[in-house]
Structure formats: structure tokens, C-alpha cells
Amino acid sequence: MEDGHSKTVDEVLSHFRVDPERGLSLDQVKEYQKKYGPNELPAEEGKTLWQLVLEQFDDLLVKILLLAAIISFVLALFEEHEGVEAFVEPFVILLILIANAVVGVWQERNAESAIEALKEYEPEMGKVIRGDKSGVQKIRAKEIVPGDVVEVSVGDKIPADIRLIKIYSTTIRIDQSILTGESVSVIKHTDAVPDPRAVNQDKKNILFSGTNVAAGKARGVVIGTGLNTAIGKIRTEMSETEEIKTPLQQKLDEFGEQLSKVISLICVAVWAINIGHFNDPAHGGSWIKGAVYYFKIAVALAVAAIPEGLPAVITTCLALGTRRMAKKNAIVRSLPSVETLGCTSVICSDKTGTLTTNQMSVSRMFIFEKIEGNDSSFTEFEISGSTYEPIGEVTLNGQRIKAADYETLHELGTICIMCNDSAIDFNETKKVFEKVGEATETALIVLAEKLNPFNVAKQGLDRRSSAICVRQEIETKWKKEFTLEFSRDRKSMSSYCTPLKASKLGNGPKLFCKGAPEGVLERCTHARVGSTKVPLTQTLKQRILDLTRTYGTGRDTLRCLALATADSPMKPDDMDLNDSTKFYTYEVNLTFVGVVGMLDPPRKEVQDSIVRCRAAGIRVIVITGDNKATAEAICRRIGVFGEDEDTTGKSYSGREFDDLSVSEQREACSRARLFSRVEPAHKSKIVEFLQSMNEISAMTGDGVNDAPALKKAEIGIAMGSGTAVAKSAAEMVLADDNFSSIVAAVEEGRAIYNNMKQFIRYLISSNIGEVVSIFLTAALGLPEALIPVQLLWVNLVTDGLPATALGFNPPDLDIMTKPPRKADEGLISGWLFFRYMAIGGYVGCATVGGAAWWFMFSETGPQLSYWQLTHHLSCLGGGEEFKGIDCKIFNDPHPMTMALSVLVTIEMLNAMNSLSENQSLVQMPPWCNIWLIASMCLSFALHFVILYVDVLSTVFQVTPLDGNEWMTVMKFSLPVVLLDEILKFVARRISDGESYIKNMHGLVLAWAVFFAYIIWGP
């Protein structure tokens, strides 16, 4: 039933043709079951394991690697002279692909749990009244249908969306925090809410499915079941939300596509260039064998071009980032989101508990100082402290005072304790104080403990004992006999108390009362001034209300309660405690004591975090279910708005936002800083508008209602104290629910992205070097310098360790003073690509040069001519050109070892270069990152292991090198440092706006030094 909240009880009953005393007949139940279906949320239709596994292989780079593995395996099967070593390459490639697939499947499985977590809010049983049986009967909740008359009482979980028709207790309170985020339980009533557009918070006559009864007993008619409930609509919205890839994932996908196209072109080119060599004598004159040989080289090229270690290094770097974030109370559930935090441009933050402490606290109060006729003055106190721990100072005009010196405060403290059903409790695990009961009542308990009006000695007491000693003292003086519960009509509650011993308040019973100032003052005839009782005139009442209104508006927007006492209350025997409508007549002839103003105070560190966000170019939007005035007041206190800033066009209520056209809503989202009185649908809509403007949004939330928006936003941030559904839908969980932890996580995300750029640059330049080396050997007709299994070793192990260590680079000092990078900013800019090509080109040439040096110049080598080397495949055919040369020399492992050693050494030096994108090694030396030095040492150690351990040297087809050969390796390797220093020098000068000609002078000079080193070096 739509708009059930706006219909009267009779209209709802007639709509379902139901008698509130007898319930539905069995025929009606069957009819409605057929019409509306079962009262349950359908299970999520998840993907099968095989679907998830196959999805992991739906990537161009992965497909190319898989194809390379299959081809290598097939070629190894048909190879005549190869042993088990031939299968190492396809086996290692498959191992990499399987490992990546396992990680991918695990992450997807993790993400699917959000919708399933909703089912925990479905109750198993419900209490209904039906025509087949008299009285209340328990049935399975899934069998409940719209029109059923349901009864609920304290502790029950609401089985469906229910329209209240009758309340049996004084009041009925519902804890609907999971759905609306309201921290205080809500009092419900049976009256119609005439607004058809009312938000869930304003539907005071509806009990929502999955929420809990905090107090009272009532009966209602079911108006929505299954997917037609408020929680069901959230489930529908979540299932319709598509997963969006993070900016990094999108860039890596684009990079993969570009790389795969380049790989395909180069592989075809290498194969085509060598068509003329297919029938060389080395292939036995067989054109097919020659074609297969060069096909193997093309496969090796594909393996060389793909950075197999990149996924593992990225995962490791992100995992390290999550550990650092966890230390800052930000627990990351989805690894890719770590990097996304770095480009967050908008943070949409909940107010309650994130920007504020979610611990109501009395900050101001006033009592009468004097009354002379209609002339009067107030004493106004301020109270410090923003948590439930009763530590804080009571000040008057900035000076600390003793509450014991003010007799009125004796009575005020007593009312706070005795007219109260709540308490504070010390959580031994978390080492914090928590509320037991209502937030507003807990604030009064804490106030009384801070006041300590009876000067109770607290020295030597532990934290728990010192926090309850005032309460214990007051409870030795007074005994609570009964409570007149809060009701909507009088907006107050009171406690009938009798004295246990003589006190300044008198020897007779008292009725201590608290409530809305307007309602309490109506029933006040006197006011307390010190220990005297003075008549309260209408003029004085107006003055109290005026000051109360000042507390409730402006910068503070405090929630005010008036405290009063009935000095001579009616006798209990004359009261009818079962009829709440008569409570109003018992709370009469009250004496006004004072007014306390409380608020959910902002966290101390939030204001500084807002300033940091502004400096970092991040817009903070506060989204809350609170009313507009309260929300704006808090926003002014924390710096989202200036003290006197006009909020027109920057602050919208949910209703105001709905009244705008689509284009106006989009415009509002582009400049707004506050949305108040919002529903879950508003949050999702705001995220959609921000995404359409290419903003990267982080959205916070804690309730079930927040889950769709958390899932839709690029970064969903759930509160540690939030619901399981919110945590499952989010990418990150704040252990301390603190906004400042989000800012710390954003800073970490930016640092991680900078480090990722460095190791991606490092790995890609290495791969370009490998491609260049294979391309050169194939194009020039040189013997193989590197084979696939060696390339895999370099890509995965030798390069992987320093690349991972680059993730430990310290963040730049100015990282939070730069604007967020754009989501569509390329991973590789034009200048970076040129640097990759320059470094990669040198790596490839040096690698091939190392192998060629052994053939042409080494004392232990054959000392061939360049022509002989480039025509080595003709050696087996004989001829004068190869007279006296043993053709087996072309299978010697020395040249491959030289090439591999040059490649590894250059890559270690290149890792050193990657410490900073533009800073020289003189400014940022290697010991800035001790992990990098350790990883370089380990990589060299592993390289020596495969060279000097016989079993491994056979697998990798390498051999030990002598001192002269190692000296040559260093000669080929060291220039890469000089080359990168030149490129960094140019980058710095260009970014500083220096003259291009000056740059060219420096560049020419540096290149001259470089070539002099190559030609005349040792």
C-alpha cells in the first residue's frame, strides 16, 4: 500500500478489508499471498565459481599470456632435443595466471556479501491476529501478508512495514537507527501524517521492517512485505547498482589494450622480417622448422613485453598501504580502493558520529540569579567535555566555579539523576564510557557527575567508580518510587521520589520533572532562586523562553530541556498510573529550577581536517538526516561554513532538493556543502550527479539505508560501529568513526599512487628494454640473447623485489597542498612515455651489446666478425666465411649470461633512479628508502644463485662469469644512471619554466660525456 502513513486508521483497514479485532480470514490470507508473494527478501543470484574464474581471464594481456603458455607447451611437446626444462616456461606462466585468478575470485566473493547481509534483519517469527484462531498466534514471518493485523512489544523485531492502529502502553519507542541513522529511539503514534512526500524519519505512524521495539506495546496493519518494504527497496537499489572500476583499474585496462596491440604488431613484424631465414641450414633446410623457430621468438617477445610481475607488485603495494591505513584506524576491505582514495575530490560525510562524537553533551545551562517582581537576571554556565566520560569544567564568565557554592545546582543535579532511566557504563575492552539508555538522559547523568554539587571526594577512585560517585551519593538521599513516562501530549516525564534522609530540599516527597521548556513552564507557578521559592509571572516565563530560544538557534542550536520540581505532589493513591492521559494533571504547581542546553558536539580534530581538505582541493559535503538549522549550526562550528556565511545555494533540505529540476539538482550538487533531512535515495542521487561531473566521491554511512550509496560511490566508507550491511557494501571501514581518519587515508592514497607511478615506470621501462633486445636480435639476425624462462625470472623475481620496495618511498611533504588528480588523467604522459622509450631503448641495446661483446671481443669468446655474428644461422652450411669456427659456439651459455647480467644490473640501477620522478639521486639518495637497498641486494643474491648453483644454471641456461666479464657488465650498465639524471634535469627545467635553449646546452654536454664514457671508458 502506497502512502499508508498519510491515510487514517479507518482508510487503511477498509483498503485491506480487515477487522482490527479479528484479523484476516484464511481466504483473504490465501488471496493476498497469491497477490503479494512471500514476506522475504529474495536471495542474491550470485555468479557461479566457474563464471567468476572465467571472468578473471577476460583480459587482453591475460589472454595473450595464456596463448603464449599454450603455444610454448605445444612447441615443447614436439621439440626433439629438449628435456623437462622446456616445460618450465608454460608452467610458470600458468602459475601466474592461476594466482591472479584466485585473488580476483576471492575479492569478488567478498564483495557479494553485502546483499546477503540484509537478510540478518529479517525476523523469523511474527505475532498476528487471524480469523481462524482467537487471540494472538505466532507464525513464520515469511507467511505474513499485507492486511495482517500484527502485535509487537518490547524486544520484538518488526516483521514487515506496519501502519500503527492502536498503542497499548503509554508510548511506543522504536529503534530505527539501522534504517534512518537516528541515534535516539523514535516515539510513534497512530495519527495520519498528511504529507504524502514525508521522509522515513517523519513517518511517525509506520513501524519499518527489521527495526526493533525499544519500549511499549502496540498493534498495527501490515502495509508492505518483502521487496515492498523500506528495507526491500534498499535491497532492490543495491542489486541494481553496477560495480564501477577504480581509476587505476580503468587506466591499467587501457594500458593493457594498447600494450596488447603493440605486442601483436611487433610479434608479427619479427616473424615477417625473418621469413627469408626460414630455410637457413640451422633449421635443416626445412621452411616449417624455420617458421616454428621464429614463432618461438615471437612468443618470447610476447612474454618479454607483458609485465607479469605488475599485478603482484600492485597488490603488494596496496596491501602495504592498507596496513599503514589500519594504523590510522582506516580498515580497507577492497585493495583497489586504496589508490582511488588518492584522487578523491569530494567527501560526502555523515554528521552524526563522524563529524560529531555521537555523544550528547550539555554545553550550557542557566538558573535564576535573582527575581525582584518582573525584574530578574540569570546565571549562565558553560560546561566543557564532549564525550560520555564525566570529565569537564563548569565555568561562569570564563572562570571555573564550584557547583556546591550554588544551592540551585544541588537541586538541578538531583533532578538530573533521579528523573532519569539511563546510565553510563565503562567499556573495559574499548576503554571508553558508553550510554545505557537514551542519549539525552545520559547527557544529564554526565552533567550531574561534572557538577558534583555535594562535593563528593573522587581522589583515589578508579575511572569507573569516579564516574558514578555523584549518582551513588544522590541515591543515598532519595528513592525513586515510580516514573510518569514521557508522552507526546505533555512532552515531559517525571519521577516520584521520597527522601531517605534529611536534605536541603526538604523532608517530604518530590516530583522531579523534565521536558520541553514550553510544556514545563505552562505548569510552573514558582521559580527557585538559591534555596527560596519565588512566584513565576508570565513576564518571567517569557524571559526564560526568550533565552531558551537563543540557546536553540544561531551558532549553538542546542536541544533544551527545562527542569522543575513539584514540592508538594499529589499522593500516589490519588494517581491513576495506568492512564497516561491523566499524567498532565499530576505534574502541576511546579517550581522552575533551570534549563540545560545539549548538543552532539563536533570532534575536536575535525576543524583542522576540514582546513586540510580545503588546502588539498577536496570539497566536503555534509549529508545528514538532522533538521536544517541544527546541521547548519554544526557546519559553522567545524568550518564547512564561515561564521556569518550566507548558505543560500550551498545548503539544501531533502524537500528543497526534490523541488528542483534535474538541471538545478545537478547545479546544486556542484556547489552544495550541506544536505539535511535526507533519505537514502537522496544520497544515491547525489553520488550519481557527482559522478556525471567526473568527481571521485567518498561517501560515509553506517545504517542499512546507506548501503546503496556506499556501493554506488567510488569509495564507500562505513563506520566501525555501523551495521554489517553497510560494512559489506563499503570499501573502507573507519574503526574510530572519525572524519579525520578519512583525511589521513586520502593522504596515504595519494602517496601510494605516486609510488605506484614510480614502480610502474620502472617495470615498463624494463619490459621495453626486453622487447628492444629481442627485436634487435631478431631484426639483426643475432643469436638469442634472452630466452622466455629468463625473461619470466627477471619480470617476476629480479624486478619484482625492487618494484615492491618502491612502494615504501616516503610521501612528498607537499602532497596535501596539491589539488586531487583527475580520474581521467593518463597513467603515462607523453613525456613519461619518451622517458620509458629512452631508458628502455638503452636497456635493450646494452643487453644485446653484452651478448655481442662476448662473441666479438671477449678473450674467452670466438672473437667473430659482425657479419659472422649476424649470419650465424648459415654456419652449419659451411663456406669460407665460417672456416675454423665450431658452430656449437652459438649455443654457448656465456653470451646469454652476459645479456641477463647486464639486464639485471641495469634494472637495479634503474630502481635507484625511480626513487623520485624528477629529483636527482644527489637530492634523494638511495638510503632514503632502506627497503630498496635491501631488495637490490636480495635481487643480486638471487641472480648469483641461478648463476652459481648447477641445477638452476641448467634450467636458466646460464653459466658463471669471470672478473673481466663482470667489469664489462658494469661498463654497459652504469650509463643508465647518467641517462636518467639527464632526463630528470630536463624535466625539472621544463617544469620550472627554464629556457629550452639552456636545456639543450646541458643536454648536449651530458650526451657528450655519455658517449665519451661508452667509447673510451675502462
From Swiss-Prot:
The active site is at residue 350. GO terms for cellular component: membrane; sarcoplasmic reticulum membrane. The chain crosses the membrane at residues 49-69, 89-109, 253-272, 295-312, 757-776, 787-807, 828-850, 897-916, 930-948, 964-984. Keywords: ATP-binding, Calcium, Calcium transport, Endoplasmic reticulum, Ion transport, Magnesium, Membrane, Metal-binding, Nucleotide-binding, Phosphoprotein, Sarcoplasmic reticulum, Translocase, Transmembrane, Transmembrane helix, Transport. InterPro entries: ATPase_P-typ_cation-transptr_C, ATPase_P-typ_cation-transptr_N, ATPase_P-typ_cyto_dom_N, ATPase_P-typ_P_site, ATPase_P-typ_TM_dom_sf, ATPase_P-typ_transduc_dom_A_sf, HAD-like_sf, HAD_sf. The keyword Cytoplasm does not apply. It catalyses: Ca(2+)(in) + ATP + H2O = Ca(2+)(out) + ADP + phosphate + H(+). PANTHER family: CALCIUM-TRANSPORTING ATPASE. This is Calcium-transporting ATPase sarcoplasmic/endoplasmic reticulum type. The lineage of its organism: Eukaryota, Metazoa, Ecdysozoa, Arthropoda, Hexapoda.
